[in-house]
């Protein structure tokens, strides 16, 4: 860490029990709300190392390649274990992606956090651990097989169930809101927007 500033961020962890944290100007202060960035990012990155350790096999670091673990699970697990669901960190971006039908472009942090919350609520948080403890006949961690064994459903079915749930939630929430024309009359300004090319 090259600065004592604790309100700017980024970092990543790798399966070799290393984490890298660097600083850069960005919007961390907006989504952190009451938390300090350094505390948040250290906990998040250390959670990745815990995940890598839990899913490690005789293939060591190469096991990550063969596990088939989706990014949403890796990032969602770190979010689930170290953060709380809050407006600027997850909810606003999540809602926007759902209402625009763009869940396939969702950041794996938000996507995964939501899916891990759903997984824990539906199956119990012990299924998260059971998924990571699974090893196939070659003694390798296989996410899809471990997920199916722990939950009883495929990852594909889980994703579809999750999609239905979040769509139902956000569209139900939206349907309770007034539209702008119910609030009052809409007026247009007497000029048109034009772009000036220099």
What kind of feature is each model-predicted range?
Residues 33, 59-64, 99-101, 112-114:
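Flexible glycine/proline-enriched surface loops and loop-helix/loop-strand junctions
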Residues 37, 193-194:
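Beta-rich catalytic cores
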């Amino acid at each position: 860490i090259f600065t004592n500033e604790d309100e700017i961020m980024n970092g990543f962890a790798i399966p070799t029990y290393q984490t890298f944290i660097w600083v850069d100007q960005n919007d961390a202060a907006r989504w952190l709300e009451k938390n300090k960035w350094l505390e948040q990012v250290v906990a998040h990155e250390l959670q990745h190392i815990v995940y890598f350790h839990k899913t490690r096999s005789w293939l060591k670091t190469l096991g990550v390649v063969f596990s088939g673990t989706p990014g949403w699970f890796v990032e969602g697990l770190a979010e689930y274990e170290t953060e709380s669901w809050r407006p600027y960190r997850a909810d606003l971006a999540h809602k926007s992606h759902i209402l625009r039908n763009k869940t396939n472009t969702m950041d794996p942090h938000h996507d995964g956090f939501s899916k891990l919350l759903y997984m824990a609520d539906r199956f119990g948080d012990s299924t998260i651990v059971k998924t990571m403890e699974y090893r196939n006949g070659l003694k390798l961690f296989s996410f899809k097989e471990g997920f199916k064994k722990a939950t009883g459903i495929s990852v594909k079915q889980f994703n579809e169930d999750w999609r239905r749930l979040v769509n139902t939630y956000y569209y139900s929430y939206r349907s309770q809101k007034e539209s702008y024309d119910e609030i009052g009359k809409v007026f247009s300004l007497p000029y048109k927007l034009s772009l000036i090319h220099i």
